[in-house]
Amino acid sequence: MELLISGYGPAGRENLVKCDEHGKVVWADTVESPSFICTAGDRLFAGTENDDYAVFTAYVKDGDGYRKTDSLRFDGVGCLCHVCYSEKHAMLFGACWGSGHLIYATLDKDGKFHHAGKLLQVNETGDDSLITRAHFVHVNQAEDTLMVNNVGLDIIYFYEIADGTVREKDRIYTERGQHPRHSVYNHDESLLYVVTELSNEVLVYAMPEKKLLQRISTLPEGFVGKSHCSAICLSPDEKTIYAANRYSESLVYFRVGADGLLSKVLQEPVEAEKPRHMILTKDGRALVVCYQVAGEIYIKPLGADGLPISGAATHFPFADAACAVDLG
């Protein structure tokens, strides 16, 4: 297993790392507070999360590691927490939780940034108590539509991607206070699964109609208290949805029915503190869980049924663990 892992913290320490499943480092670099990373082909991108500005950093594969090709700073935005890349348009997108901005830039063949832009998702609700907080970006398979989840406004925005910019074309309004954090499509994009940070649910939408089909809790039965649902994954065979809860400190496993609707099959306590991010390996055979507060990466092997194999989890330390990518 080859992983890329990022961890919060100042520049000067190795906080962007390529390693194996035991944490053995193959390559490392230092970037200021790399909150989220993504890859596309031979390219690697990292986003710097700072209260007062954001930075895109681009790399290209070089031997067993990566070589930095460029970085781009955006002023007047804050807390860049998620990035994604469109190969078709050679565009990198980022969601800024602190300021509510969508930021983007195009990339040339040498990995240099140009034609940068930013868009503020304005609070148009009339409720001044709401604060715009863009938190998630995702490009669809056709790479003609960008989805942006705004947890503060309880809106999922859809933008047309064209000519190095974006134009809004549609929205999903979730219920006030749900806070749609992250989303995942099924393979043919006929269903959209949305995990909500504050209501701690998975919402299931029929697409492209954007019709709500189901809402199901991610919390342990009878739980009362603070909880923030943080991550969602769909297995490659589309039979299992995984979600992680912070504060209530649990992982939850849902079986996906033939109709795409969910039923809970397992809830288990986490091994460390506050699972911030979670991915499935590309083969669907393991969960990789980033525990930011605990500073740990846990790898949880899964059985043929998509459920964790008892006693098989392994882990290694990683300071302020924020994000992981499976390189296959």
Regions found by a protein language model. Name each.
Residues Y8-P10, E49-D51, W97-S99, L107, ...:
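Short loop/turn segments immediately following the C-termini of beta-strands
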Residues G23-T30, K68-F74, G117-D128, R167-Y173, ...:
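A short beta-strand motif characteristic of beta-propeller blades
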Residues W27-H89:
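Blade-loop segments of beta-propeller domains
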Residues V31-G41, D75-E87, N123-E143, T174-E189, ...:
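Beta-rich, blade/repeat-based domains predominating
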Residues Y59-G65, Y104-H114, Y159-T165, Y205-K211, ...:
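Short loop/turn segments immediately following beta-strands, especially the blade-tip
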Residues K68-H138:
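Asp-box/WD-like beta-propeller blade repeats and closely related beta-sheet repeat scaffolds
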Residues L146-N200:
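Loop-centered beta-sheet repeat module
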